[in-house]
Design a protein with these regions (language model features):
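Short linear motifs at protein or domain termini
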Residues: 1-103, 210-219
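Hydrophobic alpha-helical segments typical of transmembrane helices
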Residues: 21, 51, 82, 139, ...
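C-terminal all-alpha effector/ligand-binding and dimerization domain
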Residues: 9-13, 114-121, 126, 168-219
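Hydrophobic packing residues in well-ordered alpha-helices of helical domains and bundles
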Residues: 86, 113, 132, 136, ...
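Hydrophobic, amphipathic alpha-helical faces that serve as interaction scaffolds
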Residues: 89-105, 137-173, 212
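Residue-level recognition of alpha-helical structural elements
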Residues: 82, 105-109, 128-132, 148, ...
């Protein structure tokens, strides 16, 4: 079994730059609506200009950064109502991925699902929100691998990142156990090879997130 940690240890510099910057955006280390320079990010990540620049370009395409000539790089703002829009776009593709994952899940993907579920449960017990966020990302990566549908996976990935960022901002203080329960149910259905149950659990997870988003939008 090749763990996610092992994969990370050998990842290309551009992929590492993307992963680190994405995490900084999701966890609000790069504050919403703030500005940063490319030079500051290159210095912070210590990965070289080209990998960081390529990661910035990808994050800009995904709507998480806005590169403004002579002004710097703007971190995407967080408007509560946008969480609902993200979830409306995400719901259908998550069902597609869940069904496909249940149909095509491999041993490698199953191992990654088990690893993500265990990490998520440990994060709940310890109340470690950052560890939970990382486990959620690992689960999404396992789902993309298991589904064997790169078109759906590429569509889902930025929506998952945006949603994770909203969740961290508006629900991380109270939502760990309930969120983990829904994620683990989805994993179980996928590993059972039950396409209908996996689709149903994906819809339940999206409904849970939508409830959180509706609450955030009316605060």
């Amino acid at each position: 079994m090749i763990s996610r940690e092992a994969n990370i240890a050998f990842e290309p510099a551009t992929a590492k730059a993307y992963r680190v910057l994405e995490h900084m955006i999701v966890t609000l280390e790069l504050a919403p609506a703030s500005f940063v320079t490319e030079g500051a990010l290159i210095e912070k990540l210590a990965l070289g200009r080209t990998p960081v620049r390529e990661a910035i370009q990808r994050l800009a395409w995904e709507g998480l950064l806005d590169v403004r000539p002579r002004a710097g790089i703007a971190i995407a703002p967080l408007h509560p109502g946008d969480w609902l829009r993200v979830l409306d776009a995400r719901r259908g593709v998550e069902v597609v991925l869940a069904r496909s994952a249940a149909r095509f899940v491999t041993r490698e993907a199953a191992d990654l699902f088990h690893e993500a579920a265990l990490a998520m449960q440990k994060a709940v017990i310890s109340g470690d929100v950052l560890a939970f966020i990382q486990a959620d990302k690992a689960l999404d990566d396992a789902l993309a691998l298991a589904a064997d549908n790169p078109f759906a996976a590429r569509l889902a990935a930025p929506l998952q990142t945006h949603s994770r960022r909203f969740w961290f901002r508006y629900k991380a203080d109270t939502g760990l156990a309930e969120s983990a329960e829904h994620h683990v149910a989805l994993i179980r259905s996928i590993l059972d090879g039950d396409e209908e149950a996996a689709a149903k659990d994906a819809k339940r997870l999206m409904a849970l997130l939508r409830g959180h988003a509706e609450t955030a939008a009316t605060r």
